From Swiss-Prot:
Belongs to the TRAFAC class YlqF/YawG GTPase family. SUPFAM superfamilies: P-loop containing nucleoside triphosphate hydrolases. The keyword Metal-binding does not apply. Residues 9-28 are annotated as: Required for nucleolar localization. Gene3D superfamilies: 1.10.1580.10, P-loop containing nucleotide triphosphate hydrolases. It holds the Pfam family MMR_HSR1. This is Guanine nucleotide-binding protein-like 3-like protein. The lineage of its organism: Eukaryota, Metazoa, Chordata, Craniata, Vertebrata. The keyword Cytoplasm does not apply. Residues 1-30 have a biased composition (Basic residues). Stabilizes TERF1 telomeric association by preventing TERF1 recruitment by PML. Stabilizes TERF1 protein by preventing its ubiquitination and hence proteasomal degradation. Does so by interfering with TERF1-binding to FBXO4 E3 ubiquitin-protein ligase. Required for cell proliferation. By stabilizing TRF1 protein during mitosis, promotes metaphase-to-anaphase transition. Stabilizes MDM2 protein by preventing its ubiquitination, and hence proteasomal degradation. By acting on MDM2, may affect TP53 activity. Required for normal processing of ribosomal pre-rRNA. Binds GTP. In contrast to other GTP-binding proteins, this family is characterized by a circular permutation of the GTPase motifs described by a G4-G1-G3 pattern. Interacts with MDM2; this interaction, which occurs in the nucleoplasm, stabilizes MDM2. Indirectly interacts with TP53, via MDM2-binding. Interacts with TERF1; this interaction probably occurs in the nucleoplasm and is increased during mitosis, when the nucleolus is disassembled. This binding may promote TERF1 homodimerization. Interacts with TERT. It is found in: Nucleus, Nucleolus.
């Protein structure tokens, strides 16, 4: 037992079994196993030789290049010197042309990004058969880019150019007619209003009924009109141009003139991103409209330098990135009606631009550090209202017309023959009927293949207690009588009527006659053959919606009738008791 204990016992500090670690300069030295001798392989030697050989070759090339340059300088003559100067001058002029073309994108600070945008624009022009140049109806000449039009007309493939006058709902009818008459002397021009249903992804509203039945209230809605005329123009090109396959239609123009909104309106869905700031569209995007037409969306182009006031007022440059926002506001005050601007911002009695901006900053609470009113922030707020359309404006066409330098009489004649300009003028006249001046209570919604009659009857009716209490409109459908608290006419496609929701003494009854729920095949057959399938699907969808609504209304009416019968039965029982 004693041997086992001594065997398992750890040796003490003074014993031989415990050796102290060696120290060197006061630090412990740990013993490391000796490393094996390094073996030099043949591959390492070969790689080292290859590197040396490569280095010698590079040095030899540099020496030869220096020798050739010295020999060239020795035998250089005046003639070769002049040729070299001319060559460098040509290269410099080519670079200047590229820089001028890149100035079409001054809102981009990065030169690489500007080059990328220009490449996207050139791709759209190269791949397209027809180019749609979108113009703002408030300032069509200011939105035209003659440099871009010249590029399109000079491109290979005999490109065609069509002008689209967008946002005609923001301009009086007479001014739009004058601009159409002015622009049709040069190129085919189509009046258009894009859909403004930004929160809806599919089934954007498009006006397909006869436009002579529309009124000014149509422009206050979010529906699109002018699309049928534009599709007819493209169809004429496919027919007269003898196009066998599909065509590509490029959509170009300044930022925020409505290029992407036009594509979404034709597609009737949110196919492209839209926004109220420049630079939303960054790359070319192809949208399939049907099997014959494909649309190409391009980034916005901007002619002129970055400091031009007109470019800023056309919303070609982001307002928040402006270094001097006061100068454009001064231009607005010089050209616009001061009374309307004063009433809009609630300021008056200002003499200079600084006084006006100080008053606006006071109204909006725009201050710097120390409580000083910020004229720059007030100017940016005014410019934001300007570019968003809150401050209305429009320009007049020139009194006399002269063809631009890039357009000739032959080009105008060719465009007139290809796109059937007379048919386009008649279609524009029909579209302009929507701008008729006058008050109207009708609201035109989506195309509805069903016809619904709403007749007002003056026959007496027994008062319904719930209808009188809730002050709702009384309806009569067939043999059932009931009420609806807030009828949604916009969804049902009914014309808007002046309804007295307070039940008068001679109660009026709205009788909704029975309507044929089948799709109107005759109206569908009258549409474009390419759109008949979509029209039939829309008709069937509306049929299901109306069927659900009628079932829901019938259920409500039956419940109300049953509740009335229960109340009458209880009152009789109480009287008997």
């Amino acid at each position: 037992m004693m041997k086992i204990r001594h065997k398992n016992k750890k040796p003490g500090k003074g014993s031989k079994g415990c050796k102290k670690p060696a120290r060197q300069n006061g630090k412990k030295v740990t013993s490391r196993p000796s490393s094996a001798p390094q073996i030099v392989h043949g591959n390492d030697h070969a790689s080292r030789e290859a590197e040396l050989k490569k280095k010698r070759v590079e040095e030899m090339r540099e020496k030869q290049q220096v020798a050739r340059e010295q020999e060239r300088q020795r035998h250089r003559t005046m003639e070769s010197y002049c040729q070299d100067v001319l060559k460098r001058q040509q290269e410099f002029e080519q670079k200047e042309e590229v820089l001028q073309e890149l100035n079409m994108f001054p809102q981009l600070d990065d030169e690489a990004t500007r080059k990328a945008y220009y490449k996207e624009f050139r791709k759209v022009v190269e791949y397209s058969d027809v180019i749609l140049e979108v113009l703002d109806a408030r300032d069509p000449l200011g939105c035209r880019c003659f440099q871009m039009e010249e590029t399109v007309l000079r491109a290979e493939g005999n490109k065609k150019l069509v002008l689209v006058l967008n946002k005609i709902d923001l301009v009086p009818k007479e001014i739009v007619e004058k601009w159409l008459e002015y622009l049709l002397n040069e190129l085919p021009t189509v009046a258009f209003k894009a859909s403004t249903q930004h929160h809806q992804v599919k089934n954007l509203t498009r006006c397909k009924v006869p436009v002579d039945q529309a009124s000014e209230s149509l422009l206050k809605s979010r529906a699109c009109f002018g699309a049928e005329n534009l599709m007819r123009v493209l169809g004429n090109y496919c027919r007269l141009g003898e196009v066998r396959g599909h065509i590509r239609v490029g959509v170009v123009g300044l930022p925020n003139v409505g290029k992407s909104s036009l594509i979404n309106s034709l597609k009737r869905s949110r196919a492209c991103s839209v926004g109220a700031v420049p630079g939303v569209t960054k790359f070319m995007q192809e949208v399939y409209l049907d099997k014959f037409i494909r649309l190409l969306d391009a980034p916005g182009i901007v002619p002129g330098p970055n400091s031009e006031v007109g470019t800023i007022l056309r919303n070609c440059i982001h307002v928040q990135k402006l270094a001097d926002p006061v100068t454009p506001v001064e231009t607005i005050l010089q050209r616009c009606n001061l009374e309307e601007i004063s009433s809009y911002y609630g300021v008056s009695g200002f003499q200079t631009t600084e006084h006006f901006l100080t008053a606006v900053a006071h109204r909006l609470g725009k201050k710097k550090k120390g409580g000083v009113y910020s004229q720059e922030q007030a100017a940016k707020a005014v410019l934001a209202d300007w570019v968003s359309g809150k401050i209305s404006f429009y320009t007049l066409p020139p009194p006399t017309h002269t063809l631009p330098t890039h357009l000739s009489a032959e080009i105008v004649k060719e465009m007139t023959e290809v796109f059937d300009i007379e048919d386009t003028e008649h279609a524009n006249e029909d579209t302009m009927e929507c701008l008729a001046v006058g008050e109207s209570d009708e609201l035109l919604g989506d195309m509805d293949p069903q016809e619904m009659e709403v007749r007002w009857l003056h026959s007496p009716l027994v008062k319904i207690a719930d209808a009188i209490e809730n002050r709702s409109t009384v309806y009569k459908i067939g043999n059932l009588t009931g009420y609806c608290t807030k009828p949604n006419r916009n969804q049902m496609g009914w014309p808007k009527r002046n309804v007295d929701h307070h039940c008068p003494q001679n109660n009026r009854v709205v009788e909704v006659s029975s309507v044929d729920r089948r799709p109107m095949l005759q109206r569908i057959l009258e549409t474009d053959p390419l759109q008949q399938g979509q029209a039939l699907a829309s008709a069937l969808k509306n049929k299901k919606k109306l069927q659900k609504r009628s079932d829901k209304i019938a259920t409500k009416l039956s419940d109300s009738m049953m509740s009335m019968l229960d109340l009458s039965g209880n009152s009789d029982d109480c009287a008997g008791d």
